[in-house]
């Protein structure tokens, strides 16, 4: 029983930690490409900015889904029988 709870805690930490790292890297790369594209074509800044914010929201939403799954495992663990 304690073994399962310990592994679930480890899995929750990995889900949140690796998800945060992945989302941070993704948003950083996208922001860099946005700055590069807006420097090349300044007339497209408005369209690029809109698309960048939509994609940033989608990347962040994927991370938040991972956080929700980690919270599900942490507080309503389906692997532990009551």
Curated annotation (Swiss-Prot):
The lineage of its organism: Bacteria, Pseudomonadati, Pseudomonadota, Betaproteobacteria, Burkholderiales. F(1)F(0) ATP synthase produces ATP from ADP in the presence of a proton or sodium gradient. F-type ATPases consist of two structural domains, F(1) containing the extramembraneous catalytic core and F(0) containing the membrane proton channel, linked together by a central stalk and a peripheral stalk. During catalysis, ATP synthesis in the catalytic domain of F(1) is coupled via a rotary mechanism of the central stalk subunits to proton translocation. Key component of the F(0) channel; it plays a direct role in translocation across the membrane. A homomeric c-ring of between 10-14 subunits forms the central stalk rotor element with the F(1) delta and epsilon subunits. It is found in: Cell inner membrane. Belongs to the ATPase C chain family. PROSITE patterns: ATPASE_C. GO terms for cellular component: plasma membrane; proton-transporting ATP synthase complex; proton-transporting two-sector ATPase complex, proton-transporting domain. This is ATP synthase subunit c. The chain crosses the membrane at residues 7-27, 53-73. The gene is atpE. HAMAP family: ATP_synth_c_bact (MF_01396). The record marks 60 as: Reversibly protonated during proton transport. It is a multi-pass membrane protein. InterPro entries: ATP_synth_csu_bac/chlpt, ATP_synth_F0_csu, ATP_synth_F0_csu_DDCD_BS, ATP_synth_F0_csu_sf, ATPase_proteolipid_c-like_dom, F/V-ATP_Csub_sf. It holds the Pfam family ATP-synt_C. GO terms for molecular function: lipid binding; proton-transporting ATP synthase activity, rotational mechanism. Keywords: ATP synthesis, Cell inner membrane, Cell membrane, CF(0), Hydrogen ion transport, Ion transport, Lipid-binding, Membrane, Transmembrane, Transmembrane helix, Transport.
